[in-house]
């Protein structure tokens, strides 16, 4: 677990709209040198859905090669389709990232808790690695799909070593407060 400030790092692009790896590495190092305890690349602020899988994986790998401790990284890996989410998540594990921050599938709205549970279950089965640590990403005002308290409790109960936490960006204190009551669930509000 990373304690302290985890910065949702911006993703800089060059004039050809490719990730500017040098600037990305410099930004990451500056954030870590100036008091951040960890980084969350490719979250909402990091333009996650503007970058393809290969470029995203290369950028995270570039951070590690530049000297950023992978145990200080929680990259965003959630996408609408399961195979791409599995691929990016496996890559983060291979790099020894501390965990992954995963959105629910968000293209179809109004998905039931059962459907969302099945998605995360298939993700965990597809990755098939006991080193997998998932931080669920709850930001319904952006992705249009929320995670209910009951769903998070069920996922934590079913996969206690894998579902380790939640990033709650909903801004709804009642959600944060309820998640704080779930045993052994790490809650990152904001």
Question: Where are each of the predicted segments found?
Answer:
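Active-site beta->alpha loop and helix N-cap motifs at the rims of alpha/beta catalytic domains
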Residues: 1-146, 163
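Catalytic alpha/beta core domains of metabolic enzymes, predominantly
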Residues: 126-130, 139-190
């Amino acid at each position: 677990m990373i304690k302290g400030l985890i910065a949702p790092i911006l993703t800089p692009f060059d004039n050809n709209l490719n990730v500017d790896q040098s600037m990305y590495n410099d930004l990451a190092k500056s954030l870590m040198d100036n008091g951040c305890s960890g980084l969350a690349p490719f979250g909402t602020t990091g333009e996650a859905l503007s970058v393809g899988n290969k470029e995203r994986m290369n950028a995270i790998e570039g951070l590690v090669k530049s000297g950023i401790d992978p145990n200080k990284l929680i990259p965003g890996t959630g996408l609408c389709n399961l195979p791409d989410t599995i691929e990016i998540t496996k890559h983060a594990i291979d790099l020894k990232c501390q965990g992954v921050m995963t959105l629910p599938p968000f293209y179809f709205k109004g998905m039931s808790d059962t459907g969302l549970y099945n998605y995360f279950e298939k993700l965990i089965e597809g990755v098939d690695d006991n080193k997998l640590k998932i931080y669920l990403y709850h930001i319904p005002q952006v992705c249009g799909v929320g995670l209910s308290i009951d769903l998070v409790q069920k996922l934590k109960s079913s996969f206690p070593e894998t579902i380790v936490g939640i990033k709650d960006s909903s801004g709804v204190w009642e959600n944060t407060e309820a998640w704080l009551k779930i045993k052994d669930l790490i809650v990152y509000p904001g």
